[in-house]
């Protein structure tokens, strides 16, 4: 497979490795980006790539809750200038409310659903985009349900740049649930617990850690123990219940929730623009573009 400059640039942005190392890794991996990242990690050239890659696009998240149902949405705009606009902020909350009301489980279903009589959410967004003067898109949605003996926790950070919702069963204490939602926003967990991690991801991490240990020249009889210890650290980084609780470092999140009589069932964390590229534009240009519209 031909290795392009764009591929080298992408790998460099994800790993921080040099251009020559990135090109060599892509050649070795026959253009497979994930395999190239693993190659660089095995050689000790790069750290694990962040799951979210670069945080790029602008916009906001919003949460809507009604009884035993909740919704989390992400709406993207082209510029931060528009994301701070009150009309855009109202649009984001209105869409969250509509998604919850309609029970839409995907962005595609949400766009086709009714916003108000005779108007879909897609049409509503198009009309508002025309007024605001910028492309606006509904990127993703998440729906949640709970039983009467459970609690929702939700949190919006940085005015909605990050949004999180968690379902905690066994307790109706919304303060506990909100504290966990705040932790999720700060600590970026990927899974609830170890059983949620895919076998593919476990095997991939074990392979990388094994190669790292062998490249460090460790004896084979020590490598196995090293891998076990490093896998535990890996789980503590990505599994919510294994993370050290931000609000009380004496607790792991799972143990803290257990001490309150609860158990974490599910969560979702949206950060605006995860994995999306942002056009290069400065604030002054943003203002000028708005004035021209």
UniProtKB/Swiss-Prot annotation:
One of its GO terms (molecular function) is translation elongation factor activity. It is found in: Cytoplasm. The keyword Cytoplasm applies. GO terms for cellular component: cytoplasm. InterPro entries: EF-Ts_dimer_sf (IPR036402), Transl_elong_EFTs/EF1B (IPR001816), Transl_elong_EFTs/EF1B_dimer (IPR014039), Transl_elong_Ts_CS (IPR018101), UBA-like_sf (IPR009060). It holds the Pfam family EF_TS. The keyword Protein biosynthesis applies. Keywords: Cytoplasm, Elongation factor, Protein biosynthesis. Residues 79-82 are annotated as: Involved in Mg(2+) ion dislocation from EF-Tu. Associates with the EF-Tu.GDP complex and induces the exchange of GDP to GTP. It remains bound to the aminoacyl-tRNA.EF-Tu.GTP complex up to the GTP hydrolysis stage on the ribosome. Belongs to the EF-Ts family. This is Elongation factor Ts. It comes from Exiguobacterium sibiricum (strain DSM 17290 / CCUG 55495 / CIP 109462 / JCM 13490 / 255-15). The gene is tsf.
């Amino acid at each position: 497979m031909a290795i392009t400059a764009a591929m080298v640039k992408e790998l460099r942005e994800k790993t921080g490795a040099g251009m020559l190392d990135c090109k060599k890794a892509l050649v070795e991996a026959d253009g497979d980006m994930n395999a190239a990242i693993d190659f660089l990690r095995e050689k000790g050239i790069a750290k694990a790539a962040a799951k979210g890659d670069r945080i790029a696009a602008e916009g906001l998240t919003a949460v809507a809750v009604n009884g035993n149902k909740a919704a989390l949405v992400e709406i993207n705009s082209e510029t931060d200038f528009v994301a701070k606009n009150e009309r855009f902020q109202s649009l984001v909350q209105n869409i969250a409310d509509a998604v919850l009301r309609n029970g839409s489980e995907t962005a595609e279903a949400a766009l086709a659903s009714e916003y108000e009589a005779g108007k879909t959410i897609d049409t509503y967004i198009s009309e508002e985009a025309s007024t605001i003067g910028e492309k606006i898109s509904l990127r993703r949605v998440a729906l949640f349900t709970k039983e009467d003996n459970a609690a929702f926790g939700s949190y919006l950070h940085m005015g909605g740049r990050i949004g999180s919702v968690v379902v905690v069963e066994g307790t109706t204490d919304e303060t506990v649930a909100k504290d966990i939602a705040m932790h999720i926003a700060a600590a970026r967990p990927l899974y609830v617990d170890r059983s949620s991690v895919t076998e593919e991801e476990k095997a991939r991490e074990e392979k990388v850690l094994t190669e790292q240990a062998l490249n460090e020249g460790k004896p084979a009889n020590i490598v196995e123990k090293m891998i076990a210890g490093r896998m535990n650290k890996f789980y503590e980084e990505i599994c919510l219940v294994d993370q050290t609780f931000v609000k009380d470092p004496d607790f792991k999140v799972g143990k803290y929730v257990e001490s309150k009589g609860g158990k974490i069932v599910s969560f979702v964390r949206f950060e605006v623009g995860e994995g999306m590229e942002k056009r290069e534009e400065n604030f002054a240009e943003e203002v000028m573009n708005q004035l021209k519209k």
